[in-house]
């Protein structure tokens, strides 16, 4: 029995002659946040989508709580793994409350409506992301940041042991970027997060994978992996490492 909530072995994906993921392997440790970083086109979103079955592997295997992902039905995956994706369906005529309540759908035993437990989870999720007062608003009336927080609330309402998030800080101002990532840390859940901002990776992630050209360029803790030399090798940009209140930060130089 594996101790890893998610395990990826030799994951490979190609589109035509272009290899997007090239024998990627890693484990996601329980109750830790794994950041996925790398330059544009390095395979981050493709890798994340493969973790919940949206993008099938051409080679290799992904295991969710030691069960091969390809053997699980979507309904089974959705009780174990919540998703915040960059690519969401158009639900602009839906209310915030209804969107977040959809997170409870995998737990419904029948089609007779939602239970008091479902309502409690939905209320809690909205409160956690600061959207309680917006529960009756329609999605089309929300700003990009508000809509992003509503999507995160839906994933939290799902109450899964794992959550994967693709650029969850998109459309959020600096305050909410830190609030959302701090919240995920406080929940002590197992999380996999694609992030472009290496300073956010350094501050909030326990472990990090840096992809380059579809391969794992480096894998470890942010303090070990994120250094000016590895950033230079991966991103082809110079950085100055500084300390801010004991936290490692990078200043990017042209």
Residue ranges and their predicted role:
Residues 52:
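Helix-to-loop junction immediately C-terminal to a conserved catalytic motif
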Residues 228-254:
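ABC ATPase nucleotide-binding domains
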């Amino acid at each position: 029995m594996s101790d890893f909530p998610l395990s990826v072995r030799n994951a490979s994906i190609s589109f035509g002659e272009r290899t997007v993921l090239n024998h990627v392997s890693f484990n996601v440790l329980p109750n830790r946040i794994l950041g996925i970083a790398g330059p544009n086109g390095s395979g981050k979103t493709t890798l994340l989508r493969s973790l919940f079955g949206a993008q099938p592997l051409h080679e290799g295997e992904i295991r969710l709580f030691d069960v091969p992902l390809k053997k699980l039905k979507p309904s089974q995956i959705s009780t174990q793994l919540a998703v915040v994706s960059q690519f969401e369906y158009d639900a602009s005529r839906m209310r915030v409350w209804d969107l977040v309540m959809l997170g409870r759908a995998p737990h419904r035993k029948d089609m007779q409506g939602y239970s008091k437990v479902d309502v409690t989870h939905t209320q809690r999720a909205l409160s956690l992301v600061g959207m309680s007062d917006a529960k009756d608003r329609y999605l089309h009336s929300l700003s990009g940041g508000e809509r992003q927080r509503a999507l995160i609330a839906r994933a939290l309402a799902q109450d899964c042991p794992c959550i994967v998030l693709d650029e969850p800080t998109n459309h959020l101002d600096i305050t909410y970027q830190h609030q959302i990532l701090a919240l995920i840390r406080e929940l002590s859940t197992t999380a996999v997060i694609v992030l472009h901002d290496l300073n956010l990776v350094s501050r909030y992630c326990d472990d990090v994978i840096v992809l380059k050209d579809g391969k794992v360029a480096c894998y470890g803790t942010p303090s070990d992996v994120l250094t000016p030399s590895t950033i230079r090798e991966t991103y082809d940009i110079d950085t100055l490492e500084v300390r801010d209140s004991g936290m490692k930060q990078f200043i990017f130089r042209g």
